[in-house]
Amino acid sequence: MTTFAAKADVKHAIAPSPLQTFVSTGAESIAGSSHLPNEISLARQILHNLQYQHYWSDLHVHTHSPTTHEPLPRPLLSGLPPLRLYVHPDEQVELLKKADRERKARAEGAVAGLEVKAEPEREWILPTRLNEKWTLRGLAEVFDAITMAPPAPDSSSTEGTRPSNPWRTTKRVLLASVDTDSTVVYYIVHDGVVKPRQN
C-alpha cells in the first residue's frame, strides 16, 4: 500500500540580515530627528561599513550642528579611523625630519628604518548615494554647519571643537558614496584650497 502526502505550498519567513536589522533599528532609535528615515538608514549603513569593514572606532551619528544646534542638512557621522587619513604636506615634512632625528639618535645595532608616526584624528563623514547630484552650495551648507574637527563624544562644550592637530587648518569631510550594490567609495573633500602634495 502506497500513501502520498500532499505538501502544502507554504512560504517560510526569511529572517532579515544582521545589516538590515542594524540599519532599520538605528533609524527608529534616533527620535526627534527632522531627517528622513532613508537618510538615517544611509548613515547607519555607512557606519556599519566603517566599523566592520574598515575597523573605525568611536562612531556616532550627528543630526544637529555642534555649533548652532540647528538640524544638519543631512545626518553626518564622526569617528576615529585606525590610521590617519590625511597628512598635510608641511606636517609630512616635519614628521619625516622627526623620524630621521630619532633614527640617528638610536644605537648602531638598532633597526635603521624610519618610523613615521601620524596619530589618527577624528573625522566627519558625509553619507551619500552615488546617484545624488551634489553642488558646491550643498557642500558649503554642510561645511558651514560643522566644526573643524568633530567634537569628542563625551564633551558637550565647545572645547572639543578645536582641532588637536595644529596642521589641520581647513574643514574636511570624508564623502562616503554608496552604490546600488552596497559598495562604498570614500573621497576626502576639503573646504577651500589646500596645498598640493609633493611626491
Task: Give, region by region, the residue ranges found by the protein language model.
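Helix-rich interaction surfaces within compact, conserved domain-sized segments
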Residues: 157-191, 196-199
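Nuclease-adjacent, charged terminal/linker segments that flank catalytic cores
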Residues: 1-16, 40, 188, 195-198
